[in-house]
Amino acid sequence: MARNREGLVLVLDVGPAMRSVLPDVEKACSMLLQKKLIYNKYDEVGIVVFGTEETGNELAREIGGYENVTVLRNIRVVDELAAEHVKQLPRGTVAGDFLDALIVGMDMLIKMYGNAHKGKKRMCLITNAACPTKDPFEGTKDDQVSTIAMKMAAEGIKMESIVMRSNLSGDAHERVIEENDHLLTLFSSNAIAKTVNVDSPLSLLGSLKTRRVAPVTLFRGDLEINPTMKIKVWVYKKVAEERLPTLKMYSDKAPPTDKFAKHEVKVDYDYKVTAESTEVIAPEERIKGFRYGPQVIPISPDQIETLKFKTDKGMKLLGFTEASNILRHYYMKDVNIVVPDPSKEKSVLAVSAIAREMKETNKVAIVRCVWRNGQGNVVVGVLTPNVSERDDTPDSFYFNVLPFAEDVREFPFPSFNKLPSSWKPDEQQQAVADNLVKMLDLAPSAEEEVLKPDLTPNPVLQRFYEYLELKSKSTDATLPPMDGTFKRLMEQDPELSSNNKSIMDTFRGSFEVKENPKLKKASKRLLRDKPSGSDDEDNRMITYDAKENKIDIVGDANPIQDFEAMISRRDKTDWTEKAITQMKNLIMKLVENCTDEGDKALECVLALRKGCVLEQEPKQFNEFLNHLFKLCQERNLSHLLEHFMSKKITLIPKSEAADSDIVDENAGDFIVKQESMLES
């Protein structure tokens, strides 16, 4: 086996207790082999099943025993036939012994590869571990498992145990399960093995690691605390997005008889002064240009190279800060893990000491990183301590890239904290929202968490692999319907929704959505004759469709509609200021030229007040209202003042806008004061 290839033996439980989940096991194993055909087509795979009535394995023929264990496929290069094998697993009729099956699988790997290629040999056990294992001829079961695990460790064989259980009950089952769980734990203690417990088809698909990615260091060098103290560290990728396989251009121009044709497509570009020109510009005559205002600035390759920031590779500690200062949305790219150089004992101790102190004091470290010599860019990141709970695993750090000022996006929105109480959910609405959140909790305290990232496969990738397999068999294959297992990722659990329909209905009824007529009806039909600051639903938050509101001036014809449209715009930050200023100017114009009761001016004042509350601009309205009343008094416009008083227009108090300097009592006193002045 080549150095970069893997030898894998699937050890599958097909006994009666697994019958209900075997279709899911077949699907998971089929997807594993499909990915190997794409990414690791030279890997070698063998298949062993246990729980069958018949026995078919080499150990049984050589020395006897190992009953009800069958080798479906000997270890050889993965192919389409292997994927078909796992889609048609036999349905066993007897309870199988997973220890016997593991010994058969281990024997296959040892005979195939010998003592070479350590770390490239793997067994994957899928079972519910609910059937009893046979007692050994000598010693205890613990001794037997320890012997098997030590042999696996000596041969460099890794093991994954995926335990899938559902609907198991009874004292006998519990005793057997407890014993088998203990035996599987012994494997983890004595060999390179891990056990994953799953309880759904979806988590089974995610638990079977279908693509093998070799750990490659991004960086090996010093973590510099100061010029005289440096710690040797290695940096690996911890979390990185898995993308679709690269689709390459394919040419069918090669003769069908040419077995060595590569079917490659090569693309060449020619650069010309004009499309009609026949003269091709040579590469040395081309130069890059960058726009700077209306002009294009030419910069040669030599100048670009000179501008590049070049520095020596390394990680330098800049300082420590409170973990709460680094917000979650600052994390920009893939997550790396920084581990001490395993060959340097002092590095392990130094990293452990720093990580544990950081965790105890709730601190994180800010570091400057250059991964390679001559790298064109420098990153600043945060180191978060990762204190290990296992004695055989050293402490480490998680590394996340942080943004620079140019990378941060700011979007201006009014703060919900400053909204008046009438626009916030009441106690009953808050209670039904709390119930909705509890109903949809993916990690209830008494149950296992649903949709764990480690056990949740990407449905887009799985869909692609499934379709690729179909196309390999028939070029006319159509895309099949979405698999029911993956629908649970794309849609809410229907059982959960149906069982909690009353909570859903209560929430929907508490937050009834009504059509807002303010953008469709004339302004005079919108405003009701009621006191400002009323808790009526007309005072609720108004939402606008920004695509329909491109008004940029408060006109005389429909001033209220224009005003509301302008303050709803979010394409620039100054629309609110412009709308308020223009509305104030219009009101002053209406008052100065008033020949009637001033209904239109009153409607505009009411609209201005609502807009200033919505945009949290109380000072602008309060100052304007005082100025407006003084103007009416100076010009003896008593009929206007009486009309305004009848509508109880008040200043905006703190209860409606947190930035206001007016308390609620003074807002009411304003009306009384104006009425007394009017009477005098």
UniProtKB/Swiss-Prot annotation:
Its EC number is 3.6.4.12. Gene3D superfamilies: 1.10.1600.10, 2.40.290.10, Ku, C-terminal domain, von Willebrand factor, type A domain. One of its GO terms (biological process) is response to heat. One of its GO terms (molecular function) is DNA helicase activity. The keyword Lipid metabolism does not apply. Belongs to the ku80 family. This is ATP-dependent DNA helicase 2 subunit KU80. It comes from Arabidopsis thaliana (Mouse-ear cress). The lineage of its organism: Eukaryota, Viridiplantae, Streptophyta, Embryophyta, Tracheophyta. The gene is KU80.
